[in-house]
Amino acid sequence: LLFGIFVAFNFMQQNKWEKSYRIAIGKYYKMSPDEAAKTTRFDGTCYFDEMVSPVNVGIRLSKGEKIYAVFENLSLMAYKRTGGFGFGGIFLRKKVAPAIYLRGGLGKFGLSKSLQADAVGTLYVTNKGIFYDGDKKNIKLAWDKIMRETINSDSIQLEKSNGSPVLLNGYIDPNEAAIMTLTGQLYESL
């Protein structure tokens, strides 16, 4: 019963975030909140350039680069060894004589890994790409190196053209997420 309530609550929170996210995107298409909340694909004229202004965060950028969205307190996630051992496979044991056994098989032995926070920092979205300013690690990716971004209420996943994806966990503001989505689409249309 408690598990069912927990699942229902999370589902309602996710739907609420999705609705806020669609309304935020619809604002740049000059749609009413009701119309934007029901829309799943936004087509038509986007007024992003006219409606959004760059954010000043006191960071020196390359010429012509402007910051449009800031996500604070995000954890950069990475697969790390947990210290536990993983062991599995197929093994056979055959008795040859009293107290003597013949053993053989195929197996795999290794240290187990799990997704853990590698750094905590701020993600900046610019017109030229994204950069993550973490306490232990920094990442800078140009828009042409990002194949796809997946944004949820609690994570952002950036799939790079080469290498493993970048996963950032934390609270994602739907308004900032809308700006990130539209900035990526703006780059695609150039």
Predicted regions: what they are:
Residues G4-V7, W17-T122:
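Anionic N-terminal interaction surfaces
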Residues N10, Q14-I23, K27-Y28, R81, ...:
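Acidic, Ser/Thr- and proline-rich intrinsically disordered linker/docking segments
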